């Protein structure tokens, strides 16, 4: 089997999945504030790739509500963590997204 070099450009999410670059806490937008009393602070990330959308019963696709470049809030334990080189990413289902920022 030949080795495959993975990069952001080679990752294509399927269905309603979204590939998100995790934002380091120091790079989060300053307009976001999570109080110290919050037990689990949501994670912030930028959409870098999208799936085609969820398939409806009639076979058509339901378009995703997010687009590449959007900043998202998502639960700390949602999705599947992926590391490409030194960068951290997470593969989320659209239902795991809490909100868009901005």
From Swiss-Prot:
GO terms for biological process: chaperone cofactor-dependent protein refolding. Keywords: Chaperone, Cytoplasm. GO terms for cellular component: cytoplasm. The keyword RNA-binding does not apply. Its main location: cytoplasm. One of its GO terms (molecular function) is protein folding chaperone. It is found in: Cytoplasm. Belongs to the GroES chaperonin family. Heptamer of 7 subunits arranged in a ring. Interacts with the chaperonin GroEL. HAMAP family: CH10 (MF_00580). Together with the chaperonin GroEL, plays an essential role in assisting protein folding. The GroEL-GroES system forms a nano-cage that allows encapsulation of the non-native substrate proteins and provides a physical environment optimized to promote and accelerate protein folding. GroES binds to the apical surface of the GroEL ring, thereby capping the opening of the GroEL channel. This is Co-chaperonin GroES. It comes from Anabaena sp. (strain L31). The gene is groES.
């Amino acid at each position: 089997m030949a080795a495959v070099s993975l990069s952001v450009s080679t990752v294509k999410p399927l269905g309603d999945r979204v590939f998100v670059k995790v934002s380091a806490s120091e790079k989060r937008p300053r307009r976001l504030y999570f109080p110290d009393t919050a037990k689990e602070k949501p994670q912030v990330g930028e959409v870098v790739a999208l799936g085609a959308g969820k398939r409806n019963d009639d076979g058509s696709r339901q378009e995703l509500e997010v687009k590449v470049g959007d900043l998202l809030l998502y639960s700390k334990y949602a999705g599947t963590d992926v590391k490409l080189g030194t960068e951290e990413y997470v593969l989320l289902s659209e239902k795991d997204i809490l909100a868009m920022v901005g």
